[in-house]
């Protein structure tokens, strides 16, 4: 009994409540089909578990099958599982023998997955201390790299000295490249074929593709000696054949000397871009690169003029396959190009190379430290039909979902990764996956298989008597009928039964398209929404109208598409109560006499009426004129009279508010004020039925008299009248004077005066005669006398 309870707990543990009902209505008729429905579905193989309804009810969640009466031993529910085959502990500290180093755990496991299910496993990676390093120096020997060649003549000794601080097991090798020795990549005159630099003039080696010069060795002086002997070469175009050289350096494992248990570093040094892919078609080379080693007995690339340049994808495959980490050491002009390449190549880094390679030692050391500070997982193998997701748990203890890389790690730190794997379909074959850290040889091998078969499928009763006289095979509790027979127990012959009896009327689908016709009788399908029933499966209990998302308003039952309301409810949705208790106001009047009782709720007719029984109606009666005193006080009040206005407003049962409100339910009002202004405002009611006054304003007010203008007008009028009167007086005086003058002149003209001399008048001159004057002429002498 205890074992059964444990098994039951494990069955229930994998239950998914959200999709629990998906099994029962899936229509699965075999155990395999049921398992494909979802990872939460199980099959009951118990005999006589179902009746005429057939095999559909056998597929359900484990707990539902138990509730239906299926015994636990007959429940087929294979679960996803992980079986670890090898799990050596991670290495700690320095290891004397490199073959004993373990940097990933576990190393091998078997993963069995239910389709749609997910299994999570944990992978741990720890980079061990003092790990062996193999470094291959691959140099561009085109003419522009002449000064760089002089700089690295002592590089071997200096590099070995610096690397000895990081590892006690270091080896280095050397190789060089230029370009494919074929037109149009090289000069083709006889003299320039022998010496491509003859036009300078300068002697340099003939153009070559790739030369492997020094296998990996721990003799640094041997490296220096080899470098001193090197000569430059030349080609025509700017891009070089560097990718040809990278491919050969990666795949020629034995000739280069790559060890199995070491870190493989390939340092690529150049000041130019590299040809790749179909660039070689310019030279008539059309055979794709095969990714194989083609070094001849002189350690030169023998297929340089035959095979195309490798593509980026081919380089990635071979670098990953041989655990080679690429370090691009390139000049400033080429950095952006090789950064794009490095983004595609796992584990690749880019360093800025000085014009004469003066910083190459620091560049290599920095790149090595960067590579050792990162742990990144990569997946190799056939992943079609699989879903893999990673969650990284780095040394800082923080989870990074959807990430399979940890940075800023120290050597000896452990990086953990949760790897979730799921399979989408059933397949008979097993597949092999490899998960490994980029650049390391340690791997986790995973054998993945789909768990789609039921144990009961191994027991088949052919032509079983349980299937109506042997008309079928009995397997997993159901009959698989032989050709020509049908029915849950193969009791019907296809030639004996017509589906017409399962049609409601000619032209209609059999069993209304919602069931199967077995022996002239409809067996309705299961539905996640409810029951399908009727002689033709034409009815159900879930297709009725809904109210607020509830079938028949939750106040009735759905029967064949129509709501059958319970007592006290009516309406098409059963959403209308027949009770009027909620419509009666406190005085017993229905809806306070201001509305109608509809479906147990008051629908108020009067504008402004509200409340459950229309008891609130601030706008009923004369709502505008009754608030006159409040409104006029508000418009004329200053700060000191504010309290007085509040009292007046309260007396009218209203308050004034400047807050926002809905105008849809407001009542507009207008009053004539004492100052003959038109006062407008809006009245609303709050949730408690209190009257709120909004938007008080005055308009169409008569304008007040302009006193200064009136005074100015009066003054101007008085002045004008004075001037006019003065002018009139002047005219009258002038007229009178003229009249008097005329009269005087007339009288003077009528006067008759006598002509004579005034006896009192004496003239002003006197005449005397000089008797003594002797001349003949008469002289008049005028003497003037005052006396």
UniProtKB/Swiss-Prot annotation:
Mg(2+) binds at residues 140, 142, 144, 240. The keyword Calcium applies. Residues 22-71 form the PSI domain. Residues 22-708 are extracellular. Residues 1-21 form the signal peptide. Gene3D superfamilies: 4.10.1240.30, Cytochrome c1, transmembrane anchor, C-terminal (1.20.5.100), Laminin (2.10.25.10), ligand-binding face of the semaphorins, domain 2 (3.30.1680.10), ntegrin, alpha v. Chain A, domain 3 (2.60.40.1510), von Willebrand factor, type A domain (3.40.50.410). Residues 456-491, 492-538, 539-575, 576-615 form the I-EGF domain. It holds the Pfam family EGF_2. Glycans are attached at residues 48, 97, 260, 387, 418, 463, 471, 541, 575, 695. Residues 730-757 are annotated as: Interaction with HAX1. Residues 730-787 are cytoplasmic. It comes from the Eukaryota. The keyword Cell inner membrane does not apply. Heterodimer of an alpha and a beta subunit. Interacts with FLNB. Interacts with HAX1. ITGAV:ITGB6 interacts with FBN1. ITGAV:ITGB6 interacts with TGFB1. This is Integrin beta-6. It comes from Rattus norvegicus (Rat).
């Amino acid at each position: 009994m205890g074992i059964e309870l444990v098994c039951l707990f494990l069955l229930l543990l994998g239950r998914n409540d959200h999709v629990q009902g998906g099994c029962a209505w899936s229509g699965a008729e075999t155990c395999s089909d049921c398992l494909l429905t979802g990872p939460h579905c199980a099959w009951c193989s118990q005999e006589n578990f179902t009746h005429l309804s057939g095999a559909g009810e056998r597929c359900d969640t484990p707990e539902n099958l138990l509730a239906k009466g299926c015994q636990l031993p007959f429940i087929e529910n294979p679960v996803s599982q992980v079986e670890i085959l090898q799990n050596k502990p991670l290495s700690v500290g320095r290891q004397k023998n490199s073959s004993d180093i373990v940097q990933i755990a576990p190393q091998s496991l078997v993963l069995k997955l239910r389709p749609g299910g997910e299994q999570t496993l944990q992978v741990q990676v720890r980079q061990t201390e003092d790990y062996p390093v193999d470094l291959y120096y691959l140099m561009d020997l085109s003419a522009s790299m002449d000064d760089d060649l002089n700089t690295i003549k002592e590089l071997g000794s200096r590099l070995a000295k610096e690397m000895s601080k990081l590892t006690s097991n270091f080896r280095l090798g050397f190789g060089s490249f230029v370009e494919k020795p074929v037109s149009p990549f090289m000069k083709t005159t006889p003299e320039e074929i022998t010496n491509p630099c003859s036009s300078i003039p300068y002697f340099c080696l003939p153009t070559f593709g790739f030369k492997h010069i020094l296998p990996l060795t721990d003799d640094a002086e041997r490296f220096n000696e080899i470098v001193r002997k090197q000569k430059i070469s030349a080609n025509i175009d700017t891009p070089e054949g560097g990718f040809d050289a990278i491919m050969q350096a990666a795949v020629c494992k034995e000739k280069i000397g790559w060890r199995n248990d070491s870190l493989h570093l390939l340092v690529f040094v150049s000041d130019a871009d590299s040809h790749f892919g179909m660039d070689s078609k310019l030279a008539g080379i059309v055979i794709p690169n095969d990714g194989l080693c083609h070094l001849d007995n002189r350690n030169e690339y023998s297929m340089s003029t035959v095979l195309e340049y490798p593509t980026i994808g081919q380089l990635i495959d071979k670098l990953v396959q041989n655990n080679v980490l690429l370090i691009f050491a390139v000049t400033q002009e080429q950095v952006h190009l090789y950064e794009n390449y490095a983004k595609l190549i796992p584990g690749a880094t880019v360093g800025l190379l000085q014009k004469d390679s003066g910083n190459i030692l620091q560049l290599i050391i920095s790149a090595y430290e960067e590579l050792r500070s990162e742990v990144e997982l990569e997946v190799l193998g056939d992943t079609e039909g699989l879903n893999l997701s990673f969650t990284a748990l780095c040394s800082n203890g923080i989870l990074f979902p959807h990430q399979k890389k940890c940075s800023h790690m120290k050597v000896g730190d452990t990086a953990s990764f949760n790897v979730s794997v799921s399979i989408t379909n059933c397949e008979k074959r097993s597949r092999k996956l490899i998960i490994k850290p980029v650049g390391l040889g340690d791997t986790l091998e995973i054998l993945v298989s789909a768990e789609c078969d039921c144990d009961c499928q191994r027991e088949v009763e052919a032509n079983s008597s349980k299937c109506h006289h042997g008309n079928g095979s009995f397997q997993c509790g159901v009959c698989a009928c032989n050709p020509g027979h049908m029915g849950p127990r193969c009791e019907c012959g296809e030639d004996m039964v017509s589906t017409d009896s399962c049609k409601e009327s000619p032209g209609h689908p059999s069993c209304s398209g919602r069931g199967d016709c077995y022996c002239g009788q409809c067996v309705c399908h299961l539905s996640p929404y409810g029951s399908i029933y009727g002689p033709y499966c034409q009815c159900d209990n879930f297709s009725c109208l809904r109210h607020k998302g509830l079938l028949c308003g939750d106040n009735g039952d759905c029967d064949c598409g129509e709501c059958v309301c319970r007592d006290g409810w009516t309406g098409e949705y059963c959403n209308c109560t027949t009770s009027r208790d909620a419509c009666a106001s406190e005085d017993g009047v229905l809806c306070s006499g201001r509305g109608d009782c509809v479906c147990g709720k008051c629908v108020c007719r009067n504008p402004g009426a509200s409340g459950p029984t229309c008891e609130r109606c601030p706008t009923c009666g004369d709502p505008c004129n009754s608030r006159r005193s409040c409104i006029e006080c508000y418009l004329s009040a200053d700060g000191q009279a504010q309290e007085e206005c509040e009292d007046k407003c309260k007396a009218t049962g209203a308050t004034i508010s400047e807050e926002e409100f809905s105008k849809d339910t407001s009542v507009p009002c207008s009053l004539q004020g004492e100052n003959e202004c038109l006062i407008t405002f809006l009245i609303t009611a709050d949730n408690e039925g209190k009257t709120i006054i909004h938007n008080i304003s005055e308009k169409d007010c008569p304008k007040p008299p302009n006193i200064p203008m009136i005074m100015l007008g009066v003054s101007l009028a008085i002045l004008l009248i004075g001037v006019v009167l003065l002018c009139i007086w002047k005219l009258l005086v002038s007229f009178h004077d003229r009249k008097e003058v005329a009269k005087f002149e007339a009288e003077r003209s009528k006067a008759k005066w006598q002509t004579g001399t005034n006896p009192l008048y004496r003239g002003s001159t006197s005449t005397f005669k000089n008797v003594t004057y002797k001349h003949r002429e008469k002289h008049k002498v005028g003497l003037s006398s005052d006396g």
